[in-house]
């Protein structure tokens, strides 16, 4: 889900890795290990970024690491840049769903050499502006950004200062939306819902009650199977059109989501590293596990167990 660090928040974390993303474990806290012995795997420190798709990735990787490889897995709930800082301290071994972040790759892989790439996850990531299905059906032209100002007054809220509201999610997700609104000269204001859960609920209510909502959203996302949001066409993305964050006036690219590990972990010989490197699945796979967690209210471990037992062939290919 849109996953870039907002520039203004980075400074909060530069003095240490004690902040958390979702009220989860602080770095340094241990979660329970698996049923297997730690064996040659030892401790595997896995960052968990604050969206349910990532939580699904982490649940499955942690389950396999614990139950098949005998690792002691420590999950650490962290926002993105904070997790990358942990590569250099040894407090984070892996980030298993990275959305682009060329800036962080340059800083931590190229310059500091504390991190390394570990291949793609197999997931294709989309970010954009979406409206509920009822709205796209009632006003088909609303899915073209050129027509948004015509409807701006319909999207006004008490928080949007007389303009149309463009709803974003977790404030830690870096989006291009404020720059897009400005550079496309739209009569809208970006307002943050506060979390992925709040964003989903806003779209769910909008579809149920025929409310006017337009907002930032992303795929893969299990919620799309419940409410198939319709993407608004923004000016076409072309390589380099988003190079200057303040001048962005184009759509988001398609992201080939990938995995990042600490340089030390990559050279450790740990079977957990091989698991991370070999881990790959589809958007449908992720959405299935995410739905178990978010909708069916299963624990991450129970959700992972259910998926692993139904997809043993895929799992065996990761640990062969």
Model-assigned labels for residue ranges:
Residues 39-53, 71-76, 163-167, 276:
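Short, well-ordered beta-strand elements
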């Amino acid at each position: 889900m849109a996953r870039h660090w907002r520039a203004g928040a980075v400074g909060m974390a530069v003095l240490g890795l004690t902040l958390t993303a979702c009220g989860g474990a602080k770095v340094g806290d241990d979660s329970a290990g698996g049923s297997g012995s730690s064996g040659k795997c030892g401790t595997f420190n896995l960052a968990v970024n604050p969206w349910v798709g990532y939580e699904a990735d982490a649940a499955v990787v942690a389950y396999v690491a614990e139950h098949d490889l005998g690792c002691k897995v420590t999950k650490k709930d962290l926002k993105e840049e904070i997790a990358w800082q942990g590569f250099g301290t040894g407090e984070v071994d892996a980030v298993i769903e990275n959305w682009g972040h060329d800036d962080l790759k340059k800083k931590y892989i190229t310059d500091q050499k504390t991190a390394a790439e570990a291949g793609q996850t197999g997931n294709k990531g989309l970010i954009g502006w979406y409206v509920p299905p009822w709205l796209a059906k009632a006003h088909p032209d609303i899915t073209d950004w050129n027509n948004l100002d015509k409807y701006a007054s319909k999207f006004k809220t008490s928080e949007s200062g007389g303009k149309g509201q463009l709803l974003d999610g977790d404030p830690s997700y870096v989006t291009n939306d404020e720059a897009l609104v400005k550079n496309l000269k739209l009569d809208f204001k970006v307002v943050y819902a506060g979390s992925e859960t709040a964003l989903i609920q806003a779209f769910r209510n909008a579809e149920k009650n025929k409310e006017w909502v337009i907002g930032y959203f992303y795929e893969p996302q299990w919620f799309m199977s419940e409410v198939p949001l319709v993407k608004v066409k923004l000016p076409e993305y072309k390589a380099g059109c988003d190079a200057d964050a303040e001048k962005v006036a184009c759509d988001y690219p398609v992201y080939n989501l990938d995995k990042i590990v600490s340089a030390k972990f990559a050279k450790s010989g740990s079977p957990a590293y091989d698991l991370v490197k070999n881990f790959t699945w589809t958007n449908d796979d992720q959405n299935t596990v995410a739905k178990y967690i978010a909708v069916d209210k299963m624990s991450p471990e129970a959700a992972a167990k259910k998926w692993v037992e139904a997809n043993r062939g895929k799992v065996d290919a990761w640990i062969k």
